[in-house]
Amino acid sequence: MELNGIKPSLGAKHAKRRVGRGIGSGLGKTAGRGHKGQKSRAGGYHKVGFEGGQMPMQRRLPKRGFKSHLLKFNAEVTLSALEQLGLAEVDLLALKTAGLVGQLAKNVKVIKSGELSKAVKLNGISATAGAKAIIEAAGGSVA
């Protein structure tokens, strides 16, 4: 067997369907579109969600609240992540370079998840009450 001799097995490849090319092709005249109606005409189809003039589902259902665009600027870091980071002083830049928070993050909060054995000083980073207690018990501080 050689690379230039490899071919797909018989019946594996099908010729592209050519519509509107005469009666003998089996796809002539209406070209598989049926007779009349919007879908048979040139110029495409209705837009997504259009229900023929009936009030669409998306507009019929009630709306409530909103999704805050500020959420993408907030981030959370666990105590176990701080433990693995192994730094004495942690700030926003250190967390970004370590990849623990995204580049868009502006507000970071440390949450109580995992353990912390060494002292860590947080600069410009907030912490939950439980996380703050554990950080201070380990000899660290939250500034």
Swiss-Prot record:
GO cellular component, one term: cytosolic large ribosomal subunit
The keyword Ribonucleoprotein appears for this protein: yes
Entry keyword Transcription: no
Superkingdom, taxonomy of origin: Bacteria
Region (Disordered): 1-59
GO molecular function, one term: rRNA binding
Bias (Gly residues): 21-31
UniProt-listed GO biological process terms: translation
InterPro entries recorded: Ribosomal_uL15, Ribosomal_uL15/eL18, Ribosomal_uL15/eL18_sf, Ribosomal_uL15_bac-type
Keywords: Ribonucleoprotein, Ribosomal protein, RNA-binding, rRNA-binding
Matching Pfam families: Ribosomal_L27A
Similarity comment text for this entry: Belongs to the universal ribosomal protein uL15 family.
HAMAP family: Ribosomal_uL15 (MF_01341)
Role, per record: Binds to the 23S rRNA.
Subunit structure, as described in the record: Part of the 50S ribosomal subunit.
Protein name: Large ribosomal subunit protein uL15
